[in-house]
Amino acid sequence: MPPKTRASAARKPRRKANKNITVGQAHIKSTFNNTIVSITDTTGAVISWASSGEVGFKGSRKSTPYAAQMAAEQAAKRAQEHGMKKVDVFVKGPGSGRETAIRSLQAAGLEVGSIQDVTPMAHNGARPAKRRRV
């Protein structure tokens, strides 16, 4: 097998071609440690995404509402480059950045159609983790 050349080893990632998708879904997953915002088309194919960590926050600052706001703004801007105008929001998780991320999507210029909470609730399945003692 011939050795890899420098050009093929350091390949630049290609940017997605601009799609004209006007209606989509915004999935906000807000945990106690991070907030991830994914904007998809109506079938669920991801168009843009951002997280508190990807925006530049590290450690405990990722879990703040401000970090969620910045992540939602960045995801919304990238989605608007593909023609996104209206989104239905699906919120999952107990984190502190839920409401802030929704408000940030509206402030960025996306029209929010509906908001649904899709947090998974156990019907007495696995035993939960032990209570923290501080």
UniProtKB/Swiss-Prot annotation:
Keywords assigned by UniProt, alphabetized: Ribonucleoprotein, Ribosomal protein, RNA-binding, rRNA-binding
Similarity-based family: Belongs to the universal ribosomal protein uS11 family.
Transmembrane parts of this sequence: none
InterPro entries: Ribosomal_uS11, Ribosomal_uS11_bac-type, Ribosomal_uS11_CS, Ribosomal_uS11_sf
Coiled coil feature spans: none
Gene it is expressed from: rpsK
GO molecular function: rRNA binding; structural constituent of ribosome
Subunit (UniProt): Part of the 30S ribosomal subunit. Interacts with proteins S7 and S18. Binds to IF-3.
Keyword Glycoprotein included in the entry's annotation: no
GO cellular component, one term: ribonucleoprotein complex
Name assigned to this protein: Small ribosomal subunit protein uS11
Pfam families assigned to the protein according to its UniProt record, in alphabetical order: Ribosomal_S11 (PF00411)
GO biological process, one term: translation
Function text: Located on the platform of the 30S subunit, it bridges several disparate RNA helices of the 16S rRNA. Forms part of the Shine-Dalgarno cleft in the 70S ribosome.
